[in-house]
Amino acid sequence: MSAYLDTLKFKLAGTILAAALVVPASVAMSQQNPSSQDILNALKPKPPLTRSLSVSPAEQAKKAEQDKFVDTLRNRPTRSLSMDDRQQIATVAETRPRIDLEIKFDFNSANIAQSAIPDMNSLGKALSDSSLKGSTFVLAGQTDGVGGEEFNQDLSNRRADAVKRYLIDKFGLASEHLVTAGYGKSRLKNKNNPSASENRRVEVVNMADR
């Protein structure tokens, strides 16, 4: 019986390890009430796994095109972004350091809830860190799946703008380094439960990759 249990434990451990290894590296971290250090660690560009592999000309051209696109976003109002712009932001963000924050707002409002102020201050402190100096950040507003598309799109725009204003007013962050984008209910994190609280979030992306 002991040998059987040892074998079973070994197989179970192997299964857990295999499951951990298949989690995509690009999946955004998500935390409730993260510290400023948690946010900073998530947003710091990760060093390449190896320095021996050279970047192909095609990859260099792709990165240059993405960086050029990011430059065009600075100081643009959230509502000026087209659907294609928002999709391109999401595509670039897939490979960049990012974190999902459940920033709470008043019901059907862009007013940041008092209970969310500690999280906002943690975010502001992290983005003010000298190690992130010069980075451009995307603040992507997301809503849950309750309500109409037009309403949620507008609400996500206003909530992303509210987060940006707070960071500028309270932490003196440069406006041109904070890009806001609203996605409404188009990118639900929990598609099985559209009304789930984790769908109401702000995704913060460091558009730098090194």
Question: What is the meaning of each model-derived region?
Answer:
Residues 87-93, 105-140, 164-169, 204, ...:
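Periplasmic peptidoglycan-binding/anchoring modules of Gram-negative envelope and division proteins
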